[in-house]
């Protein structure tokens, strides 16, 4: 990005996602009077006055939307982001977390929302997360990525749950990246196993 913003003349056919251009300008980047953006897309960016003067009529600008999540994220979420505000041992504190607030918003708007702004925000968010996931996976050998989907109804007491966790633990220790749809059951077991990689199997049993 920084090397791109040092260019003079037209910057063409680029998409900028969740970029704070005030930070770039504070570093002296993107301020050249001869720089013009053409056929570019700006998604959820912070646009300065100087930046707006460089916009061409061929550009598209998507402003941030009034929803409790960022529709234009350019990275995946971390556990710390999702559970900020939650305190272990205090179950009610989960209601202070980003994860809870967004889920409540989802329920309030409806699983199948009728508000076009909400459906657009969700679709753009899914698109952004897909991009971030592809960026992450591009750093891995595709033959070293193992995905587990389904098995929502598998209970933690089921022997198959334990088997999946052990398989995931073993594969993670052998350098594989374990991915899932993020749901309960088999998918939860997948991440439990990956989390327990490098620890004795007895620790997994206790968990």
Question: Locations of the language-model features?
Answer:
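Glycine-rich beta-alpha loop segments
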Residues: 2-206
């Amino acid at each position: 990005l920084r090397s791109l913003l040092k260019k003079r003349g037209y910057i063409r056919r680029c998409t900028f996602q969740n970029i704070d251009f005030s930070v770039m300008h504070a570093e002296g980047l993107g301020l050249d009077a001869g720089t013009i953006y053409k056929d570019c897309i700006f998604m959820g960016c912070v646009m300065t006055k100087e930046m707006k003067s460089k916009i061409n009529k061929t550009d598209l600008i998507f402003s941030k939307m009034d929803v409790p999540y960022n529709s234009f994220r350019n990275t995946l979420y971390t556990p710390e982001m999702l559970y900020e505000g939650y305190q272990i041992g205090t179950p009610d504190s989960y209601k202070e977390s980003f994860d809870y607030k967004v889920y409540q918003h989802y329920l309030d708007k409806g699983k199948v929302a009728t508000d076009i702004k909400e459906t657009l925000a969700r679709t753009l968010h899914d698109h952004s997360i897909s991009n971030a996931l592809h960026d992450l996976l591009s750093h891995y050998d595709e033959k070293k990525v193992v995905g587990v989907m389904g098995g929502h109804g598998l209970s933690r007491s089921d022997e198959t749950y334990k088997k999946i966790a052990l398989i995931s633990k073993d594969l993670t220790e052998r350098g594989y990246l374990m991915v899932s749809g993020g749901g309960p059951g088999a998918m939860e077991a997948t991440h439990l196993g990956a989390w327990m990689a490098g620890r004795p199997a007895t620790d997994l049993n206790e968990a």
